[in-house]
């Protein structure tokens, strides 16, 4: 978990790979269709002409780079208006691909403080599109608390609600669709083959609000996993 970013971390266990199947390219096309532009990731200024990827050749090359797990830095950057986010793929095991959709905290909180709620909605919209289009087993926005490990996800050992949560169809069956549907939340809807649960929109930028705590008590009682103190140290 990076203290410089807000990370939505998702786990895909469905084959073929989201890269070789063309699903990742389709996701990028969806983002560009609603006004996002791919950039080279140079932060200031994001909109500089030299930072924009204009041609299909440049975009295809950026996607191939993001899908090349032999490369250390595989980040795909997207931007529109006052909001930007990035996608990062990894393959922790032969059968699992993780994708992380993240935003830089300095841009999210400080670029324009009056737009923090708008940025939260932009982030949620980007996540919603991604979980709708990619075969996602589970996903969560890790802010104050560590996400579950790959092993915990594959074993269905989910014991916390985060500010944004996605449960794929297999987890819905394991945990119980009716139980998840009845969890108190600002947003609790079907997306793709799974369920998207956002206990409190404000929690995306405020952390553990009382609504998130209530939703956790409803689903999991008082037994919760380890947290961090904001500096990466385990409490």
Task: List where the protein language model places each region.
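A common structural junction motif
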Residues: 26-38, 133-138
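Short helix-loop boundary/capping segments
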Residues: 98-164
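Short, intrinsically disordered low-complexity segments
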Residues: 34-98
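Charge-rich, solvent-exposed alpha-helical interaction surfaces
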Residues: 23-26, 30, 62, 122, ...
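Intrinsically disordered, low-complexity regulatory segments enriched in Ser/Thr/Pro
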Residues: 80-114, 118, 182-207
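Hydrophobic beta-strand segments of well-ordered beta-sheets in folded domains
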Residues: 4-9, 41, 135-141
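C-terminal interaction module
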Residues: 2-4, 10-34, 147-235
